[in-house]
């Protein structure tokens, strides 16, 4: 009896909950039973990502777009309409466009450049579900150098040996299908591309990951521009850069990194679901 009482007395309890190891379920990507459910989810994430881009100052007039492949009609993709503010994007605003550039769902015009470049990327790469592009300040500044990013920070390792520089059509407004295909042909793999004198493109299996890769790539451009303004950055060795990329740079990790931003925009902008 004395032993039992002593054991009970040593229990650690807060708010009536015994402090013992618990089975905790990690965050994971949702699984859908129907195309309709998955379509709605992708559209919600697209509208939310657009609002986040607007909040972060990535809007530049009518430039910029995020696309996501339709889960059922995979040769079609959803995209933000032309000349609609990133910061006020809602699910009901989104357009469905085919690979001929026709709007097949929705009543607003589509950005011709969004069609020409993104359609070509989606066609060339079946692995790409979502693609993001904007005329963000540091991305377009860095693109003028025509260089890849260096592994100078832990975050920059997301892109180590996993992004490319595209010089074709650099600086030109791409409104021809052939020009879009020329760009896409130089982006056969990897999560990101720097289009010279234009800006950044990121792709992934989810809107979440494509959006996060864009956000962190923009900040990586900023970090390298700042570092090189005052000196010569020390590079992370190949072994460490590769290790960090493999540990943190895969699609599910990009999805996870986006979740705090998603939680915030859902709380502050519930009308995005309209």
Enumerate the language-model features and the residues they cover.
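A general structural signal for well-ordered alpha-helical packing
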Residues: 118, 139, 180-184, 214
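A conserved C-terminal secondary-structure "cap"
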Residues: 2-49, 191-274
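Class I SAM-dependent methyltransferase SAM-binding "motif I" and its flanking Rossmann-like core
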Residues: 137-179
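Short hydrophobic-aromatic micro-motifs
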Residues: 68, 77-80, 166-167, 194-195, ...
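Short, intrinsically disordered, mixed-charge
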Residues: 123-126, 147, 185-188, 216-219
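A contiguous binding-surface segment within folded domains or other stable secondary-structure elements
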Residues: 164-202
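Divalent metal-coordination and catalytic microenvironments
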Residues: 68, 121, 135, 183, ...
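An anion-binding catalytic pocket shared by soluble metabolic enzymes
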Residues: 36, 43-132, 139-152, 157
């Amino acid at each position: 009896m004395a032993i039992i009482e002593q054991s009970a007395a040593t229990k650690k309890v807060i708010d009536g909950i015994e402090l013992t190891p618990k089975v905790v379920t990690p965050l994971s990507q949702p699984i859908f039973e129907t195309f309709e459910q998955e379509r709605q989810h992708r559209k919600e994430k697209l509208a939310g990502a657009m609002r986040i881009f607007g909040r972060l100052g990535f809007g530049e007039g009518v430039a910029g777009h995020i696309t996501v492949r339709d889960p059922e009609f995979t040769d079609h993709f959803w995209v933000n309409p032309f000349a609609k503010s990133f910061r006020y994007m809602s699910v009901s605003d989104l357009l469905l466009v085919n690979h001929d550039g026709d709007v097949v769902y929705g009543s607003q015009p589509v950005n011709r450049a969004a069609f020409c470049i993104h359609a070509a990327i989606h066609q060339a790469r079946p692995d790409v579900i979502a693609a993001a592009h904007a005329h963000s300040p540091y991305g377009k500044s860095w693109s003028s150098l025509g260089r890849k990013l260096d592994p100078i920070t832990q975050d920059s390792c997301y892109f180590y040996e996993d992004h490319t520089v595209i010089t074709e059509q650099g600086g030109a407004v791409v409104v021809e299908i052939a020009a879009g295909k020329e760009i896409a042909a130089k982006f056969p793999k990897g999560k990101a591309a720097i289009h010279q004198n234009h800006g950044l493109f990121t792709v992934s299996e989810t809107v979440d990951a494509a959006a996060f890769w864009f956000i962190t790539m923009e900040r990586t451009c900023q970090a390298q521009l700042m570092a090189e303004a005052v000196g010569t950055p020390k590079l992370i060795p190949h072994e460490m850069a590769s290790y960090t990329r493999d540990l943190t740079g895969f699609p599910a990790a990009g999805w996870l990194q986006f979740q705090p931003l998603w939680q915030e925009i859902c709380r502050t902008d519930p009308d995005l679901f309209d």
